[in-house]
Structures are given as structure tokens and as C-alpha cells.
């Protein structure tokens, strides 16, 4: 067991404070590293908005939780949750709240962007609404270039060296987002950040975005959704554990 000692030091305001030392590693250093780690991992800018958005998405059935009767994704994964945020466009109050929160957080996190880009097809509608709220140009990015006409992958006018904030409706593995970002960069855009309505917080997505140095935030995410669902008794605590197990290894999970 390492010995514990106490030292004194003076802070920036001239106050004397005690610093506990374990061997050569100070507790204050451990605390600093922990805070930095938590900050890096956090993709939620406003916890209140995160819960509110999750609540709204559940109320309009954009998010469905079925731990006992799982859905099947296009990838073949079995999932106790299904999320279709495009439904929000059919509810004026909900889409207005989402649009306004996107605009506030974009201005807070990214300053003044030049262009808003939506990832097709799910984020075309909400992306255009956000661009309207911010009075900015809008473009959207297809998964791949069209095979006819002008053969565009990016629809709309995008000049070189524009500061672009990318909008997604939903982030799972991150592949579609990064494909869109790649196309935007190849067109000369500078990516300021990526924002989504909802993020599953899969580890594979975090690794991919970190590798590409993409600044990512979401209005809501899986963790806030589960917390809200438990608080409002939408699910039992035992079902919440099933949801957490699925998120930890969605490709291996079995109901």
C-alpha cells in the first residue's frame, strides 16, 4: 500500500491548500484527468434538453422501447429499441422545439457557421429547418453520387472553405455521418462539428469520430433516454438493464 502524505501549496489567489499525495501521483492530478475524460466523453451540451427531447420522442412514438419484443434492424441486429426521428416533422410543436434547440446549441458550441448540411435522408427536413432558424444556406449530402443528371452527391450550393455544421437525425455506428463528412471535405468544406437529435453512444461510433477528429454533440442520447424511462416508469429497472446490455454489444445481443 502506498504511503499517504500531505503537502501545502498556494493557489492562484494566494490561499494555502492541502494536497494529498499518493507516491508520486497527486490526487489533484487524478481529479484533473478524470474531469478531462468525462468532458471528452460527454456529447450532451444541455442535460435538461436531453431529457426533454427524449420525452418528446417517446410521446410521439418516434422512439419505441420493446425489451421483450425486439425489433430487427436493416443490419440484422436484434434491438430492444427503435428510433425514427423523422416522425417529429409531423408534430409542429416538437419539430419547433428541436429546431430551436439545435440553433441555440450550434451558436453556443460552434459560433457562427456558414452552412448547415443535412445527411440524407433522415436529416434533410430538420436540417433545412435549422438552417432557416439560423438564416443560413442549406445543403444535403446523399450516401453516394447520383448515377444520372448532374451526378451530384451534395445537393445545393457549397462554396470552398465554408464553415459547415453537419446535422444528423440519428447516430448509431457513425458510418453514414462520416461518409457525408468525407464528401463535404472533398468539396472543400471545413467541418466545424456534427450534431444529431439522438445518439446511441455506441463505442464504435466514438472511436470513429475520435479518429477523424470530429467534434460531435447530440440533443439527446441513450443514457438520458433510459434515465427518463425509469423515472417515468415507461420501463422497469430490470428492462433498463436489458437495454444497457444491448448497447454494450448490439451485434451479439440476443433477447
Residue ranges and their predicted role:
Residues 127-165, 173-179:
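Short, glycine/charge-rich flexible loops or terminal/linker lids adjacent to PRPP-binding catalytic cores
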Residues 44-59, 182-255:
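PRPP-dependent phosphoribosyltransferase catalytic core
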Residues 111-120, 195:
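Short glycine-rich phosphate-binding loop at a beta-alpha junction
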Residues 114, 162, 192:
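Conserved acidic residues
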Residues 43-111:
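Active-site-facing substrate-recognition patch
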Residues 24, 31-34, 38-42:
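Short, positively charged and aromatic/hydrophobic N-terminal segments
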Amino acid at each position: 500500500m502506498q504511503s499517504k502524505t500531505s503537502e501545502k501549496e498556494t493557489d492562484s489567489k494566494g490561499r494555502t491548500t492541502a494536497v494529498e499525495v499518493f507516491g508520486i501521483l497527486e490526487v489533484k492530478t487524478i481529479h484533473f484527468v478524470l474531469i478531462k475524460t468525462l468532458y471528452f466523453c460527454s456529447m450532451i451540451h444541455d442535460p435538461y434538453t436531453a431529457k426533454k427531447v427524449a420525452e418528446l420522442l417517446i410521446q410521439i412514438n418516434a422512439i419505441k422501447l420493446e425489451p421483450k419484443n425486439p425489433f430487427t434492424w436493416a443490419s440484422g441486429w436484434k434491438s430492444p429499441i427503435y428510433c425514427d426521428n423523422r416522425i417529429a416533422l409531423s408534430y409542429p410543436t416538437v419539430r419547433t422545439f428541436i429546431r430551436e434547440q439545435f440553433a441555440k446549441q450550434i451558436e453556443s458550441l460552434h459560433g457562427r457557421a456558414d452552412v448547415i448540411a443535412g445527411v440524407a435522408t433522415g436529416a434533410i427536413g430538420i436540417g433545412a429547418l435549422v438552417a432557416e432558424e439560423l438564416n443560413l444556406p442549406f445543403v444535403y449530402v446523399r450516401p453516394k453520387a447520383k448515377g444520372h443528371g448532374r451526378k451530384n452527391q451534395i445537393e445545393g450550393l457549397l462554396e470552398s472553405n465554408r464553415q459547415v455544421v453537419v446535422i444528423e437525425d440519428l447516430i448509431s455506428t457513425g458510418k453514414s455521418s462520416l461518409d457525408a463528412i468525407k464528401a463535404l471535405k472533398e468539396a472543400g468544406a471545413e467541418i466545424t462539428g456534427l450534431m444529431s437529435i439522438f445518439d446511441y453512444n455506441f463505442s464504435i461510433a466514438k472511436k470513429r469520430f475520435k479518429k477523424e477528429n470530429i467534434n460531435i454533440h447530440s440533443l439527446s442520447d441513450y443514457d438520458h433516454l433510459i434515465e427518463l424511462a425509469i423515472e417515468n416508469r415507461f420501463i422497469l429497472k430490470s428492462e433498463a438493464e436489458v437495454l444497457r446490455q444491448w448497447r454494450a454489444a448490439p451485434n451479439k445481443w440476443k433477447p
